[in-house]
Regions:
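Short glycine/proline-enriched loop/turn "hinge" motifs that connect secondary-structure elements
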Residues: 2-4, 140-145, 180-182
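Cofactor-binding loop segments of dinucleotide-utilizing enzymes, especially the Rossmann-like FAD-
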Residues: 15, 154, 191
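Helix-loop-strand module that forms the ligand-binding subsite of alpha/beta enzymes
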Residues: 82-166, 171
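Residues at the starts of beta-strands that form the adenosine-phosphate
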Residues: 9, 44, 147-148, 185
């Protein structure tokens, strides 16, 4: 790596309370990331474990309008707890925006994914950050540079290809919401038949 080279970022988002050696999705994600880094020396990894990190639950007082967190002056009028929550939401959103490649590792739960991932997505879906409102239209803002999302999902059984649009609602949602924000390249890595305890 040449001195002065600006490093790109891979943001690894894990969504499983199990330790890595007991989680199929996290084990596969780690192998994928290690291989990726071997081939892409200009990348560094930043990790966030949604079961260990604090992900705020959104409250009405955090917003000045739809999908728009209160500005810094108004945030100072909130109590200390709420100010910290607003700061955390901003930090999560800024961290997401700064990445070039995203890897999400999650199990399929109830045809979807664990709840912390939805709470995280709610935090990063911000007006003038990842999307913008233009009249009655919503425009993506994450199409400003090449970005790629890799969604690694484990499931206990095998989901037949023809039933995936019906049964794989979590995968479909993640693909749709990422493209909604402007992340055009979406790759899926499905780890099926891990056993019904996975």
């Amino acid at each position: 790596m040449k001195e002065g080279t600006i490093m790109k970022k891979l943001l690894y988002i894990s969504v499983n309370s199990k330790p890595e050696d007991l989680s199929a999705s996290k084990t596969v994600a780690r192998k994928f990331i290690n291989k990726f880094l071997q081939k892409n020396k200009d990348f560094q990894v930043e990790e966030i474990d949604l079961y260990k990190e604090h992900i705020p639950r959104l409250e009405y007082q955090y917003f000045e309008k739809r999908n728009c967190i209160v500005n810094e002056d108004d945030a100072k009028k909130l109590n200390d707890k709420d100010q910290k929550e607003v700061q955390r939401i901003r930090a999560l959103c800024d961290q997401f925006i700064s990445a070039n490649v995203y890897v999400i590792a999650a199990p399929m739960w109830s045809l979807s994914f664990p709840a912390p991932l939805k709470e995280y997505i709610d935090c990063i879906m911000q007006d003038q950050k990842t999307i913008k409102f233009e009249g009655k239209k919503i425009e993506p803002l994450l199409n400003d540079k090449p970005r790629t999302m890799v969604y690694i999902q484990s499931s206990g059984g095998n989901v037949p290809w023809m039933l995936r649009p019906i049964m794989n609602k979590g995968l479909n949602y993640i693909e749709d919401i990422m493209k909604f924000m402007g992340i055009k390249k979406f790759e899926e890595l499905l780890v099926d038949d891990t056993g019904f305890t996975e």
